[in-house]
Amino acid sequence: MRKIKRNDEVIVIAGKDKGKRGKVVKVVGENRVLVSGVNTVKKHEKPNPMKGSTGGIVEQEAPIQVSNVAIYNSATGKADRVGFKLNEDGTKVRVFKSNSEAIDA
């Protein structure tokens, strides 16, 4: 089970976008995530009439290392760490380390 999943709200804890918050759009491989509005880069795109793109300089998000983001705890308003606990029925759930609340509702 992964500590950070798609649709989690995360906060950047290191790098040029430190302090920015966003939702995880996609988990790329083992140790990278794509976060909306964070780590934007400018890509030069050729015009492609088949796709309908006009080309030019396009701004888009680039993947960021998982170690540079932390899950955002809305109850405390801070970045938090993720732990795992077993429920009564034996299923594993993710919890915040600070207040032991379940992340997956």
Swiss-Prot record:
GO terms for cellular component: ribonucleoprotein complex; ribosome. GO terms for molecular function: rRNA binding; structural constituent of ribosome. The keyword rRNA-binding applies. Keywords: Ribonucleoprotein, Ribosomal protein, RNA-binding, rRNA-binding. GO terms for biological process: translation. It comes from the Bacteria. SUPFAM superfamilies: Translation proteins SH3-like domain. InterPro entries: KOW, Rib_uL2_dom2, Ribosomal_uL24, Ribosomal_uL24_CS, Ribosomal_uL24_KOW, Translation_prot_SH3-like_sf. The keyword rRNA-binding applies. Belongs to the universal ribosomal protein uL24 family. PANTHER family: MITOCHONDRIAL RIBOSOMAL PROTEIN L24. One of two assembly initiator proteins, it binds directly to the 5'-end of the 23S rRNA, where it nucleates assembly of the 50S subunit. One of the proteins that surrounds the polypeptide exit tunnel on the outside of the subunit. Part of the 50S ribosomal subunit. This is Large ribosomal subunit protein uL24.
